[in-house]
Amino acid sequence: MSRTLAAMMVAVLTTSPLAAQEREFGRQRQAPAIEINLPYDGRYSFARIRYGSTGGGGFGRDRMMWAHDYPRAELNFTKILAEVSTVGARLGSSSVITLDDPALFDHTIAYIVEVGAWAPNESEMAALRRWLQRGGFLIVDDFDSRDWFNFESQMALVLPGARLQPVPLTHPIFDSFYRITTFDQVRHPYSGVQTTFWGIYEDNDPAKRLILLANRDGDIAEFWEFSDQGFFPMDLSNEAYKLGINYIIYALTR
C-alpha cells in the first residue's frame, strides 16, 4: 500500500467539515454542501451522468440509480486528486448532466453507475457516440455481472461494431500515475467478487486510445464515499483511489 496516499487520505478527509459532520450524526448522515453544474472554467470537474430515475425527485441516493454514492464519493475523490496531483480539480462541486446535455462536451471524462438500469434514448446515444469519438472517456462503475447484458447491449447501440475487451494489468492506464502491480485487492466491497476491467478501444485496437473503462463486479466509488469513516480497510480504499486517479490522468494525457 502507498503510505503517502494513505496518510494523505487521513489528513485530508478526517479533518474535513464533512467528516466532522459524519461523526456527529453517525448513521443519520446529513447531505454535504455541494455546488452543482457551475459554469465551465477550465478546471477538472467531476461529471456524473444522470439518466432515467427509479422514482422520486431531487438527488436522493436511494431513489435514483445514477446517484449511488453521490455526492460524497466525488467530493472525497476530488480532494485527494487535488492533493496528490497537479490536476486543477474543482473542489466542493460536481456536474450532474444527461448525455444529451451540450455541457457534456465541456468535460473530457464522465462517470456513470448502475448500468443494469441504464436505457439511453436515441438522442442520448447519439450524443455519447459523438463525445466518445471526439476524445471523451467514460468510466463505468458500481455494477455486477447481472447488469452486464444490459450494459453490453446498450453500448452495441451506441457504438455499433465496437467490442468490450478485457483490459490487462499491463495497459498504460494502470501505470499512468500509480503503478498498479496486482488486482488482488480490487474486489466488490460487499460481495467480495474479484473486479475485472473491460474497455472499448478506438477501432477495437488495443494499441489505440481507450475510450471507455468498466469496473465489472466493482464499485470503487463506494470506497471513496466511506473512506473518511473507517467503514472499509484503509488499504482497500487506497487501491480505489489509486485506480480513480489513474483513470483521470490517463484520460487527460491521451
Model segments located where?
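Positively charged n-region of N-terminal signal peptides that target proteins for export
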Residues: 1-4
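Surface-exposed patches in mature extracellular/periplasmic domains of secreted proteins
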Residues: 85-98, 140-144, 162-170
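An acidic, glycine-rich "communication" segment
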Residues: 24-30, 54-58, 145-226, 236-241, ...
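Short alpha-beta junction capping motif
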Residues: 46, 104, 109-150
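Aromatic-Pro/Gly-enriched surface loop or interdomain linker
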Residues: 20-109, 115-116, 219-254
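Extracytoplasmic/secreted envelope proteins and their assembly/folding machinery
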Residues: 74-78, 125, 129, 152, ...
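Hydrophobic/aromatic-lined pockets within catalytic cores
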Residues: 136, 159-160, 252
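Bacterial N-terminal signal peptides
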Residues: 6-16
